[in-house]
C-alpha cells in the first residue's frame, strides 16, 4: 500500500504541534475570526502573518464539544476523536491552500476551531462528520486568506 509522504511525515497524520493550544490565539480566533456553519459543526478560522520565520505549522486546529450540548464525558470524547479523525483525513485541502512552497503564502498561518453544535439526541456518523468538515474547509477561500 502506497502512502503519500510530506517532509518525511505521513500527510494524514495529526502531529502534536498542529493542535492549537495558545490561549491568546484561541481568544483572537473567536473574537476576530470568520466562521462557517454546517448541520453538526461550526468552523472558526483566521489567518495570522508573522515576519519572523515561525516554527509553528502553517495550519493549527482545535476541537471542542460543549458540555451543555453533550453532557456525558464519554460521548464528548468520542465526538472529539471522530472530529479529529475526520479532519486528519481531509486536512490535505488546507495544506494545498496554505502551501508553504509558494512565496505569497510565506509567513501566513491559519488557525481553525472546529466546534460541535449538534444536539445530544443522536450523534452523526464518522462519514457525515468527514463530509461536513470537507465542505466547511472548502468554504475557506484562498482570496479570504491572502
Swiss-Prot record:
Q: Which domain of life is it from?
A: Bacteria
Catalytic activity reads: Endonucleolytic cleavage of RNA, removing 5'-extranucleotides from tRNA precursor
Span of the signal peptide: none
Quote the SUPFAM superfamilies the UniProt record gives: Ribosomal protein S5 domain 2-like
The protein's GO terms of the molecular function aspect are: ribonuclease P activity; tRNA binding
Q: Name the Enzyme Commission number(s) assigned to this protein.
A: 3.1.26.5
**Keywords associated with the record:** Endonuclease, Hydrolase, Nuclease, RNA-binding, tRNA processing
Please list the GO biological process terms of this entry. Answer: tRNA 5'-leader removal
Q: How does it assemble?
A: Consists of a catalytic RNA component (M1 or rnpB) and a protein subunit.
Family, according to the entry, reads as follows: Belongs to the RnpA family.
Q: What does this protein do?
A: RNaseP catalyzes the removal of the 5'-leader sequence from pre-tRNA to produce the mature 5'-terminus. It can also cleave other RNA substrates such as 4.5S RNA. The protein component plays an auxiliary but essential role in vivo by binding to the 5'-leader sequence and broadening the substrate specificity of the ribozyme.
Could you tell me what this protein is called? Ribonuclease P protein component
Tell me the name of the encoding gene: rnpA
Amino acid at each position: 500500500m502506497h502512502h503519500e509522504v510530506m517532509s518525511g511525515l505521513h500527510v494524514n497524520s495529526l502531529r502534536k504541534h498542529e493542535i492549537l493550544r495558545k490561549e491568546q490565539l484561541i481568544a483572537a480566533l473567536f473574537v476576530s475570526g470568520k466562521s462557517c456553519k454546517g448541520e453538526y459543526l461550526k468552523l472558526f478560522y483566521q489567518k495570522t502573518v508573522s515576519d519572523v520565520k515561525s516554527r509553528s505549522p502553517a495550519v493549527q486546529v482545535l476541537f471542542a464539544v460543549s458540555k451543555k450540548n453533550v453532557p456525558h464525558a464519554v460521548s464528548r470524547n468520542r465526538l472529539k476523536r471522530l472530529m479529529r479523525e475526520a479532519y486528519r483525513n481531509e486536512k490535505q485541502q488546507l495544506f494545498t491552500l496554505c502551501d508553504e512552497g509558494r512565496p505569497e503564502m510565506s509567513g501566513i498561518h491559519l488557525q481553525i476551531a472546529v466546534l460541535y453544535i449538534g444536539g445530544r439526541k443522536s450523534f452523526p456518523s464518522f462519514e457525515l462528520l468527514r463530509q461536513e468538515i470537507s465542505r466547511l474547509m472548502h468554504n475557506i477561500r484562498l482570496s479570504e486568506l491572502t
